[in-house]
Amino acid sequence: MDTKDLLIQAIKDAVAKAIAEQALPEGQLPTVILEVPPKKELGDFASNIAMQSARVFHVAPRKIAEEIVSRLDATFLEKTEIAGPGFINFYLKSDVIYDALANLLKAGSEYGNLPKQETPRIQVEYVSANPTGPLHVGHGRGAAFGSALVNLMRAAGYNVSSEYYINDAGKQIDNLALSVNARYLELLGKEVEFPENGYHGQDIIETAKRIIAKDGDKYLNMSDEERLSIFKELALKEKLAALKEDLAAFNVHFDVWFSERTLHPDAVNAVCDKLLANGNMYKQDGALWLKSTAYGDDKDRVVIRDNGVPTYLAADIAYHDNKFERKFDKLINIWGADHHGYVCRVKAAMAALGYNADDLEVLLLQMVSLYRDGELVKMSKRTGQSVTLSELIEEVGADAARFFFIMRSLDSQLDFDLNLAKSQSNENPVYYVQYAYARICSIFRQMKEAGIETTENPQLSLLTDEAEIALIKKLLSYP
């Protein structure tokens, strides 16, 4: 328990003692909130608890403050003052501040982290881009936000699992195989019509080139079906590996990579059976429909088409059912803003399956616009396609990119200034932070050069300068 928590408990104990001694009437004490005063002269902590509890006890705030202060048992306080109508200002003893700093140094990067709680179990799913091409800057924003959210929640003690949903089933993967196949045949001198919904990126050509470099025309005389089956697996494996490499370079890592393929057909059939059994799915015109209007959607949704092929919604229902079956108490999805209309139908499906739809929270990610020299950057100079995450990392660095991505609220469009992200000036917040860190490191370097060694038990009481004490208190204000 840190000093702040100890002080809050001491205030609660003082109020309880005042009530027991009938100095205050019976009543439920409001939540005790401590704040750091705007001026150092007003103490290390301040509380308006006396004013907050005046309407509970029906006693003047200053009188309540006096009863609290007179019964306060806190040996770590130098003094306590009552100000104005009933503010209480608390002043810590110097040795308490030094002890807290020693604990901070001992804790290192773990300082401020709260103890891990086993429950609730929370899952955060983010990025989940189709493995059909490189990640672009929009994916980068989702990756930075999701990663930061998971890190913060873990530091706050939450039991969090991060997950990437691999869309490795369905038409987009078929189109990936068709695209690689077309480029493979073209490179081997065959005339072929490029698929209508194929992927035109340079990365597809490079994949085909690598296949030829490794295996030559080995697949040329195979049937289209056999060749497409092989290319689907080769391309998927390569794209997924590249995707993981880009995310690792961005310092983004996942606990679970969940394959959509594992849901077909058993899990999809199972949720359809559940929904049919509980009356929340019906058959019409040969298709299976979810009664999503019963749960707030604007119309019922097709889950299985009349030709027996599942819609995207079918796999998503099975996937989210699987999440709850894994005993997660809270699901957080980070989706692109273009999925806005999809939120209601997935929540409706969860409610139809008997889950609490509020246990699924969807955060929508707005667009990112890149600017260079004041001009909107629409295409990559290198590829003529959308700017990829790896290109952004190469240009401004992973740290700067992550910093800029999470500087703005997720629900507002982000204008990413490439020049600012690279500038070495105080206008660039990343440079400002990195420069401060570099200056701190230089102090340790100069100490080493001067033969001054650090010790595990420094004499912190030598830190008496006003600026030093102010800096220590600033450090101790976290979290």
Predicted features and spans:
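Non-catalytic interaction-recognition regions
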Residues: 1-98, 109-479
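Short, charged, solvent-exposed linker or helix-capping segments at domain edges/interfaces
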Residues: 99-104
